Amino acid sequence: MAISDMRRQYSKGSLSESDITSSPFSLFDQWLKDAIDAGIPDPTAMTVATVDSTGQPSQRIVLLKDVSDKGFVFFTNLGSRKAQELSVNPKVSCHFPWFFMERQVRVCGSVEKLSVSENAAYFFSRPKDSQLAAYASKQSKPIGSRALLLTQFKQLKDKFANKALPVPDFWGGFRIVPHQIEFWQGGEDRLHDRLEYNKAEDGRWSTQRLMP
């Protein structure tokens, strides 16, 4: 299959210095709203990249569950590969691919764990079957078959049919605290727009345009 000639022209918008806000989170909020309003499937999906102790990177897609001036929040099993790697090396990068809008956002930073109360607030907001799934799956561990997983899920569902589940101690959230955020808008003839925010030690953000 020949793929070297697969390409398309980008023409849906531009990104100029007049679009810059003092905080990158204001621009991110607007872009996220645009993605949601456009009906893009899974607009909160982001790829999170981590690195293990040997320097080997790995990536996976998770869902953004909160964003504020503090950073970007996601939740996971604390025994998962990503959580284990973040416990050794908290440096992380995430990426939002809004292809329909011809936009991307790239974030670099470090993670911090959420508090017990923050974890509980989100856990209890989830549908009960999602809560059960957190218990049924020992994320990233081998399992003999899908049937075994479904059996474990059903056993838990029967056990907790009439009672609430406690917040699992092996599950929780991370906040990506960024020091760099890049906004990318596809442009005609591959002359894309790239605006990068960088955070100084005093907490203020500066911006610069990058060549495509």
Curated annotation (Swiss-Prot):
Binding note for cofactor: Binds 1 FMN per subunit.
Keywords noted in UniProt: Flavoprotein, FMN, Oxidoreductase, Pyridoxine biosynthesis
SUPFAM superfamilies referenced in this protein's UniProt entry, alphabetically: FMN-binding split barrel (SSF50475)
Enzyme Commission code: 1.4.3.5
Positions annotated to bind FMN: 60-65, 75-76, 81-82, 104, 139-140, 184, 194
Cofactor(s) in the UniProt record: FMN
Subunit structure: Homodimer.
HAMAP family: PdxH
Protein name: Pyridoxine/pyridoxamine 5'-phosphate oxidase
Lineage, opening ranks: Bacteria, Pseudomonadati, Pseudomonadota, Gammaproteobacteria, Alteromonadales
